[in-house]
Amino acid sequence: MRLPNGLYAAGLDADSDDAAGHTHEGIYYLWNQDLITDALGTDEAEWLRPLVHLEPCNDNGLGTLQLRGRVEWERINADMDTLLEARGRRSAPARDEKAITVWNAMLIDGLVEAGMILREWSWVEQARELADSLWTAHWDDSMALRTSFHDRPGVPAVCEDYAWVALSFAGLAGATGESVWLDHAVEVLGEAVARFSAVDGSFLDAENSFLLTVTAHTLTDDACPSPTAAMVMALRRVGLMAKRADFIERANKASRGPTSSGVSNAAIRRLGPGRLPHY
């Protein structure tokens, strides 16, 4: 999924072709016993059979491999390597090669959190490398990009992009001790507050424009947490780390509005006692 510029691609297509050239959803990742036997040979496939549970996902009896029971890790890892090599000869799904700021920022945040919890320091280093690539490719003075495609700039960033960059960079600063990431987070968050603040104290999805008769104003979670939820989390984290009382107060102001977002309400609760909204 990693692109040449260090960012991560948006996704892979669900569909790809089978050996006969017919298109199926998920076919690239699925197996049955015959395919396993073709890849491993009869003896090894029979050894593996009781150790993997094949749950059919379609009418062809194909499914994903799910380990069960006690296994010999050295042997089964060798088998998995062989199956992975066999899968690599299949027709791979197409890759959407645009890079999206918010998704890359969420990946940074996830790598940092998982790396710290599981003590996988290489994940924190991967997060640092990704953050460096994201800052280089998608930030220009005070303006961020939402997308790029093969290093060509796309549309301007929206609120969730700014919020997650600030949130993830602050987390990276805490994990690495490198203050430059907190400086970047403060810069990005300041721009976000200036660009996306709504009159009711919450945050707009995108900047006001003469092209828009109504500016979107989302408080509910969808594929990503709502922009207001992300901004509250970012303002709180960056405000505490950078000792910016104005950011914390802005988070408090935004917290008075959300009504139906799980992440928004979770963000409010992080503000502490006495900060919950009253309806």
Positions of predicted regions on the chain:
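Glycan-recognition and catalytic cores of secretory/periplasmic carbohydrate-active enzymes
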Residues: 1-279
